[in-house]
């Protein structure tokens, strides 16, 4: 492994975390179990500077280890661009191994000019069990090519080194998972508990090259992931958040001990201000629909912001943006409401795709520039008969967790814990009411305990259950207590 004290190595580790090349949560692996950490180095192709740094370090590593071969070959597919750059920098011819032979043309499995007896150095991005490297080794050996070494970017430390060595191939890694975790912890990016949770998982989940588990007890393996989103405390999750306002909200919830959002769906400014003042001590978030306020004014917003500061809660405008980027930017930053100037958070549909995030960022303008702002993306709805399906939810999750604009995403509005895995996002679940049921307009209500413990809600949204109560203040306190107790039960399991 390259000298771990290198500033360049540590800077790269932090950069990979920043661009979501690896993330924490609960991810399904190829071997059939869930992992608390996932590497997706495919994203580096969108960051030429990162590609260059990784390739430079690979070349340096090859020189340090005095590895020589007549060819280099990247394991398909993520390692192919890395192997290409290594080939160019070293002046070493490259071979391309296909995952499957073409059914037409030359039908070759290995492309390039080579002779039997030639040596080849394998390049790989991430190694778990080592099976992908061994598949490449077998195909190269089938062509008479000699393979003795492989260089990899990340070793997950789950048996890959030993598995590959059994087949006469030495593995040399730039990073180990342990080094990456320690670097993030030392830089204050993750908690010690996260490091320990992943270490526990790695110790329990050692994998043979055929995908079976060392020791054979899959039951212990399945139980090893302690980084499932719903198991973690708000404090632990705050450090994993990519969004500054999400981090702030996590910490606010933890310190104030409330995961209650009040939906202030009222039509007069004085009514909203009154309920915000009475219920403010018990909520983490006040959700508005400013377009239904009949006497909206700048003074109303100033008074609302003052109450938010006094009682320590954030403001969310439930605008549900859903237009093209340019229109969304205008709706967010312009008009009579100037939402970006005062709302800490907004909501948006993912129907327009990733452009919705770019439009919102563009709409920050002068009013919201330099302030912590974020969005909750709508992945599911509580209305019966809504048209959102599983594919839409899956694509919404991708928009929330992948790409260059994830730093603007604070959370997801949804009804189920499987809508997303990343613990740095918050799940906002509407339709909370002590008396479960469906209203005359199709809104479905569920109890505080059900939405938190069964549905995975991090924040429960209550509207009429508080607004229609004889004492909104007492009702808010009751909902706060029950939602918080449900959260405590959830993380205690």
From Swiss-Prot:
Residues 234-493 are annotated as: OMPdecase. It catalyses: orotidine 5'-phosphate + diphosphate = orotate + 5-phospho-alpha-D-ribose 1-diphosphate; orotidine 5'-phosphate + H(+) = UMP + CO2. One of its GO terms (biological process) is pyrimidine nucleobase biosynthetic process. Residues 208-233 are annotated as: Domain linker. Keywords: Decarboxylase, Glycosyltransferase, Lyase, Multifunctional enzyme, Pyrimidine biosynthesis, Transferase. Pathway: Pyrimidine metabolism; UMP biosynthesis via de novo pathway; UMP from orotate: step 1/2; Pyrimidine metabolism; UMP biosynthesis via de novo pathway; UMP from orotate: step 2/2. CDD domains: OMP_decarboxylase_like, PRTases_typeI. It holds the Pfam family Pribosyltran. It comes from the Eukaryota. Residues 1-207 are annotated as: OPRTase. The active site is at residue 320. Gene3D superfamilies: 3.40.50.2020, Aldolase class I. GO terms for molecular function: orotate phosphoribosyltransferase activity; orotidine-5'-phosphate decarboxylase activity. Its EC number is 2.4.2.10, 4.1.1.23. In the N-terminal section; belongs to the purine/pyrimidine phosphoribosyltransferase family. NCBIfam families: pyrE, pyrF. PANTHER family: OROTATE PHOSPHORIBOSYLTRANSFERASE (PTHR19278), URIDINE 5'-MONOPHOSPHATE SYNTHASE (PTHR19278:SF9). This is Uridine 5'-monophosphate synthase. It comes from Drosophila melanogaster (Fruit fly). The lineage of its organism: Eukaryota, Metazoa, Ecdysozoa, Arthropoda, Hexapoda. The gene is r-l.
